Amino acid sequence: MEKIWLKSYPPGVPHDVNPEQYRSVAHLLEESFRKHAKSPFSVCMDRWMNYGELERLSGALGAYLQGLGLQPGARVAIMLPNIPQFGVTMAAVLRAGYTCVNVNPLYTAR
């Protein structure tokens, strides 16, 4: 199978990641914050966010969630469209030691 999406990867981005090198996605994020603080994480409507901003924002939100008294491993539902705030929220939940439950915002009652 041809992996055509690999053609859109910027130079230096590996095509494969060894999943055993990280204990969790949170650990992958922490390494990304250290290595790529000034590199772009996302862009939306010409507003760029780098990994340093992601670290700062997700850390603040994660601390807020912990301040609510949630127990480690608690499930946190995230109902957001595909916007940069989703990445911030997901990183915050994982870094705080919780489990992400992604909920499609297009779901209806029926």
How would you label these PLM feature ranges?
Residues M1, S24-S32, M79-I83:
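Short, functional N-terminal and low-complexity linear motifs
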Residues M1-Y22:
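Flexible, non-catalytic linker and terminal segments flanking ANL/adenylate-forming cores
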Residues K3-W5, H27-N50:
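AMP-dependent adenylate-forming
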Residues V17-Q21, K38-I83, G87-L94, T108-R110:
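Conserved AMP-binding/adenylate-forming core of the ANL superfamily
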Residues G97:
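Structured binding elements
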Residues V103-P105:
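Short beta->alpha connector loops at strand-helix junctions that form conserved
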